Amino acid sequence: MSTSDMIKQLCEHMNISVAELARRIGQTPQNFNKKLQRETVTLKELITIADALDITYEQVFILHSGAKIKTGNKDAS
C-alpha cells in the first residue's frame, strides 16, 4: 500500500476528507493533493498528520537480532 493510499484510508477511518486533513496540517487542499499524487509526503508531514489527528505514527526497522530502530511522533524508544 502506498503512503497516499494509507493517508486516504486514514481519512476514511477518521471520518474526515483529505481536504480537511490538509487544512488541519496547515496546507492547502490543492498542494496536499499534489503531494499525494506525486507520492512526495515527507516523514515530517506524516508526523504532523499524526499529531493533528491525535494518533501515533511510527516507522520501524527490525534487525535480524529482533532489535528495533524507530522514529515517530510519540515515544519512539
What spans do the regions from the language model cover?
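Alpha-helical residues within the helix-turn-helix
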Residues: 12, 23, 51
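DNA major-groove recognition helix of helix-turn-helix/homeodomain DNA-binding modules
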Residues: 44-59
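A short, Lys/Arg-rich alpha-helix, primarily the initiator
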Residues: 1-14, 20
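The DNA-recognition helices of helix-turn-helix-type DNA-binding domains
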Residues: 28, 39-40, 67
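Helix-turn-helix DNA-binding elements, focusing on the entry/boundary residues of the two helices
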Residues: 7, 18, 29, 43-46
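Amphipathic, hydrophobic secondary-structure cores in small proteins
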Residues: 33-44, 48
